[in-house]
Regions:
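Bacterial N-terminal signal peptides
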Residues: 10-22
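N-proximal helix/coil linker or "cap" segments that precede and/or mark the start of modular domains
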Residues: 28-64, 206, 217, 222-264, ...
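Short pre-active-site segment immediately N-terminal to redox-active cysteine/selenocysteine motifs
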Residues: 84-86, 91-94, 276-278, 283-286, ...
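A short beta-strand-turn-helix
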Residues: 65-86, 257-278, 298-304, 350
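Short, internal strand/loop/helix patches
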Residues: 140-178, 182-183, 190-191, 328-361
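Thiol-/selenol-based redox modules, centered on thioredoxin-like
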Residues: 185-258, 361-409
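Thiol-based oxidoreductase modules, predominantly thioredoxin-like and allied folds used
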Residues: 116-141, 156-166, 308-322, 334-346
Length: 409
């Protein structure tokens, strides 16, 4: 049995969180077959979240904050007192819905900054509260370091603040999902909260409630619509951390096996007979760059394994070193298909897999379902670049269809 399949039951029960349904919307989904108990527990958790973290009431004062930003500075509510209108939007790195709105958030800054509006983004999630499979649409996690990488990658023109350490600010504002926007007037009274517009795909949005609210406040008029539903990824409160640990522990409990691989087996591997996106990494225990990058490659697979991605590791250690290879793989919890070449003829290994491979290890290749090479690299890979390439090429369907384009942009 495929080792990943042994996790299917567990993953099915938490798939809604993975694709990021808001708690109120998640309750409308059908329970995954055979997972009634876990589904009931999930619904109960979402209900508790809404009760324990109510959304700030319209007309309420903006709660104060002092949070670190991706620029290395501390930012407080009072820093924005000169702005006649303040928009605070809760976003997250990992959420595909939030990613799809990044361009629209940047456009709000571009279109309204000259009119005195300040927009601030806050990341509310506890990094340890997101399960590995919930990171299946992202290159980075929800940590402050991940935020810095995302802000630089997407050139955010706004302050991006981190609340994941204590979630004290998120507790006061009560964002149900990311993205969730709150707009305050000159007296810092909440005049609008909800969605930015009415469709994940920008071209299909017909109602732009956040812009309507900004225009009304700048003109001194009442906001036409003060509240809307929100759709996105549920806020990852630290109370979810136990569930995230459970998934990681389930992965780490999987058996780690090692197969001998002949030249013919390597040639079959290169043909990608399973017709999924295939990540292949050739490595050795004596290779420092291999050992350094391997945990990051494995983590990448752990995040994306629900999206038709396979990962195969191939050790080029001498066959006599099988025990050392097994020890390394077991320590790394490498519960994937692990191969070790059955020969000391490394040039034969290279020719059997890729006749154009003309250097040593590490050697990494990404093969498309139809067998063509998407990426290959001799030497240690840039893991962020590799993740972005995978995200641009993995199947792109469902509620977040169009997300691959975000990574190709």
């Amino acid at each position: 049995m495929d080792k990943t399949a042994t996790l299917a039951t567990w993953i099915g029960a938490t798939l809604v969180a993975c694709i990021g349904m808001a708690p109120a919307l998640a309750a409308d989904q059908a329970a995954p077959a055979g997972n009634d108990a876990r589904w009931t527990a999930y619904q109960a958790q979402m209900s508790r979240d809404q009760q324990e973290h109510p959304t700030l009431a319209l007309g309420a004062d903006a709660p104060g904050f002092a949070l670190p930003g991706t620029d290395g500075k501390l930012h407080a509510l009072a820093d924005y007192k000169a702005s006649p209108v303040l928009a605070i939007v809760f976003i997250s790195n990992h959420c595909p819905a939030s990613q799809l709105y990044e361009g629209r958030i940047k456009a709000l800054v571009h279109d309204y900054a000259a009119r005195g509006v300040t927009l601030v983004a806050i990341a509310p999630n506890g990094p340890e509260a997101a399960s590995p499979h919930e990171l299946n649409y992202t290159d980075v996690d929800d940590s402050l370091e991940g935020m810095k990488q995302r802000a630089a990658f997407r050139q955010f023109p706004f302050d991006y603040l981190y609340d994941g350490e204590t979630q004290a600010v998120a507790h006061q504002y009560g964002p149900k999902v990311t993205p969730h926007i709150f707009i305050f007037d000159s007296q810092r009274k909440l005049r609008y909260e909800g969605r930015i517009d009415d469709h994940l795909r920008e071209a299909r949005a017909t109602h732009h409630e956040a812009r309507d609210a900004l225009d009304a406040l700048l003109a001194g008029r009442p906001v036409p619509v003060a509240h809307t539903p929100v759709f996105g990824c549920s806020t990852k409160w630290m109370s979810h951390a136990a569930s995230a640990r459970e998934e990681l522990q389930a992965w780490q409990a999987q058996p780690v096996t090692l197969e001998a691989a002949s030249f013919d087996a390597l040639a079959r591997l290169r043909s990608n007979p399973d017709h999924k996106t295939l990540l292949v990494n050739f490595w050795a225990t004596w290779c420092a760059p291999c050992v350094h990058e391997y945990p990051q490659l494995l983590q990448t697979y752990l995040w994306y394994r629900s999206r038709d991605l396979d990962f195969v590791s191939v050790s080029v250690d001498d066959p006599s070193q099988r025990a050392s290879v097994e020890k390394f793989l077991a320590t790394a919890h490498s519960a994937i298909r692990n191969l070790q070449v059955d020969t000391d003829d490394v040039y034969g290994v290279m020719a059997a897999f890729d006749k154009a491979w003309d250097s040593g290890v590490p050697f990494t290749m990404v093969i498309a379902p139809d067998g063509h090479v998407i990426f290959k690299h001799a030497g240690e890979v840039d893991v962020l670049a590799l993740r972005r390439l995978l995200l641009a090429n993995l199947p792109d369907a469902g509620p977040f269809a169009g997300n691959a384009e975000y990574w190709r942009d």
